[in-house]
Amino acid sequence: MPTSDSGEPRRIAMKPNGVTVPISDQQEQLPCPRCDSSNTKFCYYNNYNFSQPRHFCKACRRYWTHGGTLRDVPVGGGTRKSAKRSRTCSNSSSSSVSGVVSNSNGVPLQTTPVLFPQSSISNGVTHTVTESDGKGSALSLCGSFTSTLLNHNAAATATHGSGSVIGIGGFGIGLGSGFDDVSFGLGRAMWPFSTVGTATTTNVGSNGGHHAVPMPATWQFEGLESNAGGGFVSGEYFAWPDLSITTPGNSLK
């Protein structure tokens, strides 16, 4: 190993091309320019440039280039472990914020009432909301729905001669007449056909006239030509009793 004039051994630095260069004094332990600590070490040369030796301070865990400009990095920055701690703290803070949002100062969120207009239009029939449907314009859902069904059914009965919606009052929720004639408490169905009639309504014949169609007992029809027992009505329609459903008689031939 080559020695210096003073007799001390000298370390040799190897270039990438194989040329040996003696290590200068810049590779020795230099004080840290940030914290003035002597616990430093030489790391490498920037881009293999011997004029830019790179050093590392073990005290403040920062790199610097001897003779270069120090970056504006705060002294005493955190390591990876501290970064993990900060990430955990951020998660806990976000969870606490979400808890505050879900429970705003311990006061439960109040439900917003559903507002309906004072009048609603359905199939050309105007229904005016009264005080019995609800308090003010904030109506209870059950009351407004019930009144809408009842008024719509009554208006359709006055327009077409029979109900144009299916009555579901037999379900026990107070929505008017239902399927009670089906013998299990559901009431008579009312289908949206203009030529359909109940036991006391009228049907439109082929000549444009009106005639009464009596309805027999549930699910019973007697002769094909009997108007009283169901079957063919005036030779043109086949009626299912108590369901007020008519189909062309020619379809059964």
Swiss-Prot record:
MF-aspect GO terms: DNA binding; DNA-binding transcription factor activity; transcription cis-regulatory region binding; zinc ion binding
Source organism phylogeny: Eukaryota, Viridiplantae, Streptophyta, Embryophyta, Tracheophyta
Any one GO BP annotation for this protein: positive regulation of DNA-templated transcription
Region of interest (Disordered), ranges: 73-103
Tissue spec. comment: Constitutively expressed in the whole plant.
Zinc finger (Dof-type) residue numbers: 30-84
GO annotation, cellular component aspect: nucleus
Biased composition (Low complexity): 90-103
Main function: Transcription factor that binds specifically to a 5'-AA[AG]G-3' consensus core sequence. Enhances the DNA binding of OBF transcription factors to OCS elements.
Pfam families with a match to the protein in the record: Zn_ribbon_Dof (PF02701)
Subunit structure: Interacts with OBF4 or OBF5.
Induction: By auxin and salicylic acid (SA).
Intrachain S-S bonds: none
Binding site for Zn(2+): C32, C35, C57, C60
Keywords associated with the record: DNA-binding, Metal-binding, Nucleus, Transcription, Transcription regulation, Zinc, Zinc-finger
InterPro entries named among the record's database cross-references: Dof, Znf_Dof
Subcellular location: Nucleus
Protein name as annotated: Dof zinc finger protein DOF3.4
Source organism: Arabidopsis thaliana
